[in-house]
UniProtKB/Swiss-Prot annotation:
Pfam hit, one: Ribosomal_L3
Post-translational modification: Methylated by PrmB.
Stored InterPro entries: Ribosomal_uL3 (IPR000597), Ribosomal_uL3_bac/org-type (IPR019927), Ribosomal_uL3_CS (IPR019926), Transl_B-barrel_sf (IPR009000)
Gene (UniProt): rplC
GO molecular function: rRNA binding; structural constituent of ribosome
Protein name: Large ribosomal subunit protein uL3
Length: 247
């Protein structure tokens, strides 16, 4: 199981195929996505990679957080997240994951925070049908109607679908196809819509319900930056070259 990446949503556009068909795509940008630390089964009880992306000022950053980035010898990051991986998919601390970590044609799962829509009624929030347009209904055409019974049960049950705040939820969209990658600019173009607004942070992983392509690099495509911990040749997995460039 490979690591995912932290990307930033740029917006939507379209690309054309050789046959002239256009494909709607969402542009995701990798902003110096680097490895900050390892989580091992011996110390933490599970195996994972801690990644960071984006730039952050240290003016109001607590010393404890600054110390974590100093230990990893990485510039402070705006967004930090963990990705579960297998033991043979660990990437050196400080390495920067590149856009060709994903190959064209493979499927990915994306997770983001949906756009906030404020206080919404039952018809918009839960797709209720509303009340009748005529025959005695006045003003309350878009209301949800009764929310409970009579004397029995004599109450409104918990979790009843009602008007309220809509959006700003953690949403995962499965099986989006990678249409194109741009290593120089750090761009990943995926087919379809991605949850969240422009500038929002998106977690991109290999699809769990689709097979991983054989040409996908393992443990990933990365480059060692600065004083990153290089993989020893004796300890490196069989599919991990101990070079400056990742697999």
């Amino acid at each position: 199981m490979r690591s995912g990446v932290i990307a930033q949503k740029v917006g939507m556009t379209r690309v054309f195929t050789e046959a002239g068909e256009h494909i709607p795509v969402t542009v995701l940008k990798l902003s110096n996505c680097q490895v900050l630390g390892h989580r091992t089964s011996e110390k933490n009880g599970y195996v994972a990679l801690q990644l960071g992306s984006g730039a952050r000022k240290t003016v109001y950053m607590p010393k404890a957080e600054r110390g974590q980035f100093a230990v990893a010898k990485v510039a402070p990051k705006r967004k930090v997240a963990e990705f579960r991986v297998s033991e043979d998919s660990l990437i050196p601390v400080g390495a920067e994951i590149q856009a060709d970590h994903f190959v064209v044609g493979q499927f990915v799962d994306v997770t983001g925070t949906s756009v906030g829509k404020g206080y919404a009624g039952g018809m918009k929030r839960w797709n209720f049908g509303g009340l009748r347009a005529t025959h005695g209904v006045s003003i309350s055409h878009r209301s949800i109607g009764s929310t409970g019974g009579r004397q029995d049960p004599g109450k409104t049950f918990k979790n009843k679908k009602m008007p309220g705040h809509m959006g700003v939820d953690r949403i995962t969209t499965l099986n989006l196809r990678v249409v194109q990658t741009d290593v120089e600019r750090g761009l990943i173009l995926v087919e379809g819509a991605v949850p969240g607004s422009k500038g929002g942070w998106i977690a991109v992983r290999d699809a769990v319900k689709k097979p991983l392509p054989k040409e996908a690099p393992k443990p990933g495509k990365f480059k060692v930056v600065g004083d990153a911990q290089a993989v020893d040749e004796d300890k490196a997995p069989a599919d991990t070259p101990a070079e400056k460039e990742g697999a």
